[in-house]
Amino acid sequence: AGGSESDNWALKATAEAYASKGKHIITTKIEHHAILHTCEYLEKRGFEITYLNVDRDGLISLDELKAAIRPDTILISVMFANNEIGTIEPIAEIGEIAKEHGVLFHTDAVQAYAQVPIHVDEMHIDMLSASGHKLNGPKGIGFLYIRKGVKIRSFVHGGAQERSRRAGTENIPGIVGLGAAVERAMRIMDSKTRKEIELRDYLIGRLENEIPHCWLNGHRTKRLPNNINFSFLFIEGESMLIMLDMKGICASSGSACTSGSLDPSHVLLAIGLKHEEAHGSLRLTLSEDSTKEEMDIVAEEVKKIVQRLRDMSPLYEDFLKSQKNN
């Protein structure tokens, strides 16, 4: 349930409903695995998927999108904001292009919903996925917004619940909890966003200015208010996570949904990072409860840990030797 089911439903049920019109779907290389794996599933069943490239900031090219649309294109699915690097895509422009070509537009807004303003009519969004756990709501509950008039097949067959589109007894506690979480998130969004942007930019500035051989991943301004993603050369991100955890700091080296994987992030590879650069990444997520004091603590600990790991790194030692020789 939640965001993954919503993404699956949007793609699979739309593909089935519009298969007579065409079997071509457009998405991006940096989508959540709930989209990418669903696309792989559809490819095995005769659908053709075009995966759009992104630039170094994680943004798609609108010209590439326009060029990818064909007479048999039935759906464009582009995430609103990336869960790893925080980049916010040009959703309104994508929606306008989709509308002009008579193609349905779905956006995975799990990471962006209640973080940034979303207007489904102005942005020409036909379907939108969201999840409660990103709003401090219950886990395992989410929703799929479907514009009136969009044909979509039932995802779970059985009873007539949810307008006969998703059978099964409704999770009433989850639904009520999600509703309460959305109401609260919308109420505090403006003040929360202002606070998070201020703290985010403060911490980004400290890390950039005080740690050499590192950089920010994702767009500097077109990004989620609460997202920070850095790459640090000459270290392994997993080692940094362990040492941060010992200091009581929660972080990740990629998507929380792939925390058990040793493979480099597909998102970081898609924006052009080398494998070793992607392995040295750190993702930090802020909240409404974050403070400037905590940002200072994180900055100081990251500085110490990066230096400690580099002191043990043969790659860093080789780099220093090469600098001396030059």
List where the protein language model places each region.
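Pyridoxal 5′-phosphate
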Residues: 1-326
